[in-house]
Swiss-Prot record:
Class in the EC hierarchy, top level: transferase
Chain sites annotated for binding Mg(2+) 2: D224, E225
Stated name of the protein: Anthranilate phosphoribosyltransferase
Chemical reaction(s) catalysed: N-(5-phospho-beta-D-ribosyl)anthranilate + diphosphate = 5-phospho-alpha-D-ribose 1-diphosphate + anthranilate
UniProt GO MF annotations: anthranilate phosphoribosyltransferase activity; magnesium ion binding
GO biological process per UniProt: L-tryptophan biosynthetic process
Positions of anthranilate 2 binding: R165
Organism of derivation: Streptococcus pneumoniae serotype 4 (strain ATCC BAA-334 / TIGR4)
Function: Catalyzes the transfer of the phosphoribosyl group of 5-phosphorylribose-1-pyrophosphate (PRPP) to anthranilate to yield N-(5'-phosphoribosyl)-anthranilate (PRA).
Residues annotated to bind anthranilate 1: G79, N110
Length: 334
């Protein structure tokens, strides 16, 4: 382990084999907490390569829980977090809109690390049981078309990494890895990151992980979602090719809002915001959700443009389909 950390300290990249070996040792309890923290910091300072990120994701997925389900076209819209925007739970709210629009949403998430409320926190406040067994979660998914997978329970091997990660208190390769290690073999994905310089390389990792179609999004002001406060950049993975583009609210015929307009609060406050959006109450929260759900529909390939996706998201919410999915999840995942 010492040799690996010294190599990273010299800003030398690890091979896929080296990274695989290191992570296997970590997730089987053979590395100290201090060494793990040093590794995470060294990788962050050097800059993580697609090969390193693919290797860690493949190892972590190999140690994840298996969710038995009859659904084979699941999608997720989990972001990396770590943007310190203190926004409401955008992707979690948008997940219900996507599910209401007919997409099988397997929402993967965790408790907050750098904000007041993570996806697990807000859903727990809404009565969702975070601790169902994998077989029970599979049944929920089959019955409702939506399920929440609590990352802590899905990845028992993460217990070896979490103490060092929490102690550091800064975004590391594990933030970048979280959305990549979904327990299910996803076909499509919308993945938010707070570092736009990693758009293309993250799309490359998704390609390496077998995604058929995906979008990696980096919003304005470091937001790890699409934003109405400036220019949003995306990388689209389609037919094995990656293309980069950007858009503004004006491009989509939408009104702009400042970052402070979408500030959230604690889990209970964010739960109330989520409900207000699904009830179609006009606000910057609603508009931001519509934007991100629209981008999700486009990432899934359900429609042909982000603008069409935004229109579909509005219809789904207005018809009560998104709220209906929340009620179903509350009924079955309890």
């Amino acid at each position: 382990m010492k040799e690996i950390i010294e190599k990273l300290a010299k800003f030398e990249n690890l091979s896929g084999v080296e990274m695989t070996d290191v992570i296997e040792r970590i997730v089987t309890g053979r590395v100290t907490e201090a060494q793990i923290a040093s590794l995470l910091l060294a990788l962050k300072m050097k800059g993580e390569t697609p090969e390193e990120r693919t290797a860690i994701a493949q190892v972590m997925r190999g140690h994840a829980q298996h969710i038995p389900t009859e659904i084979h076209d699941a999608m997720d819209n989990c972001g990396t977090g770590g943007d310190k925007s203190f926004s409401f739970n955008i992707s979690t709210t948008a997940a219900f809109v996507l599910a209401g629009g007919g997409i099988h949403m397997a929402k993967h998430g965790n408790r907050s690390i750098s904000s007041k409320s993570g996806s697990a926190d807000v859903l727990e406040a809404l009565g969702i049981n975070l601790d169902l067994k994998p077989a029970e979660l599979g049944k929920v998914f089959d019955k409702t078309g939506i399920v929440f997978l609590f990352a802590k329970n899905m990845h028992p091997a993460m217990k070896y990494i979490m103490p060092a990660r929490l102690e550091l208190g800064i975004p590391t390769i594990m933030n970048l890895t979280g959305p990549l290690i979904h327990p299910m073999a996803l076909e499509t994905q919308l993945l938010g990151i707070s570092r736009p310089e990693l758009l293309e390389s993250t799309a490359q990792v998704l390609k390496n992980m077998g995604r058929k179609r995906a979008i990696v999004v980096a919003g304005p002001e470091g937001l790890d979602e699409a934003g109405l406060n400036g220019t949003t950049k995306i990388a689209l993975l389609e037919n094995g090719e990656i293309s980069l583009s950007s858009f503004t609210p004006e491009d989509l015929g939408m009104e702009g809002y400042a970052m402070e307009d979408i500030r959230g609060g604690n889990a209970q406050e964010n739960a109330e915001i989520l409900l207000s959006v699904l009830k179609n109450e006009a606000s910057p929260f609603l508009e931001t959700t519509v934007l991100n759900a629209g981008l999700g529909f486009y990432a899934n390939g359900k429609i042909d443009s982000i603008k069409e996706g935004v229109a579909l998201a509005r219809q789904v919410i207005a018809r009560g389909k998104a709220l209906e999915k929340l009620r179903l999840l509350q009924e079955y995942q309890k």
